[in-house]
């Protein structure tokens, strides 16, 4: 009986000591050591990790409250040499949804997004140091075939974008300028036969558009702005 009482007291003392050792600050008031915070009004953890004189170090875990239970939603591994962190976002089942580098709140460098219930890459993107999309963005079907290819400059669509069928056939080909459709556009069916072609001008169809069936031109439509004539006085 005495041993049981001593064991209970030891557990209580251990918890008290541990509680005193977490959520501490240094002489300058900066967070230092192990920190752990719960969701308000609950005993469910919201985040936990370690600070070194105000700087996050090592692994941090972040949770969401799901049915009043903490569920791990993100893991950040902080770099000791700078403010960057390698981040993995997780589903409620623990599967990695996306992963890449962050500096503060900005995505930086290569980011990978995964298909649901699969470890196959769904989207591959690249960000600059300002968190803006740069260069080629690729979207994949589950079997690894490219579904979409686009190009970005400073976070905006620029140049040619293409969409593909599961068999790798081009279905659409557009030209963008400063995030707007601007230039020639072509639509195809799954047999790679041309369905329609024309031009966009600042996001709107412009000029003569041609439409096809079975490779034959079937109709044309002119999207040119009508000429307004002033009435004679």
Predicted regions and their residues:
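Glycine/tyrosine- and acidic-biased, solvent-exposed loop/turn segments at the edges of beta-strands
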Residues: 18-233
């Amino acid at each position: 009986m005495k041993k049981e009482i001593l064991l209970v007291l030891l557990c209580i003392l251990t918890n008290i000591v541990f509680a005193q050792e977490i959520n501490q600050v240094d002489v300058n008031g900066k967070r230092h050591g192990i920190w752990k915070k719960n969701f308000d009004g609950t005993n469910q953890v919201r985040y936990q990790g370690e600070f070194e004189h105000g700087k996050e170090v090592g692994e941090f875990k972040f949770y969401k409250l799901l049915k009043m239970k903490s569920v791990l939603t993100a893991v950040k591994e902080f770099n000791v040499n700078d403010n960057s962190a390698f981040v993995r976002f997780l589903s409620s089942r623990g599967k990695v949804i996306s992963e890449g580098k962050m500096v503060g709140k900005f995505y930086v460098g290569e980011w990978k997004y995964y298909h649901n219930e699969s470890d196959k890459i769904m989207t591959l993107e690249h960000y600059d140091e300002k968190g803006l999309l740069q260069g080629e963005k690729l979207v994949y079907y589950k079997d690894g075939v490219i579904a979409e290819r686009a190009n970005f400059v400073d976070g905006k669509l620029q140049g040619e974008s293409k969409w593909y069928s599961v068999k790798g056939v081009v279905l659409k080909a557009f030209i963008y300028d400063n995030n707007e459709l601007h230039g020639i556009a072509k639509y195809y069916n799954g047999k790679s036969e041309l369905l329609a072609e024309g031009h966009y001008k600042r996001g709107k169809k412009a000029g003569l558009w041609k439409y096809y069936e079975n490779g034959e031109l079937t109709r044309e439509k002119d999207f040119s702005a009508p000429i307004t004539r002033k009435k004679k006085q």
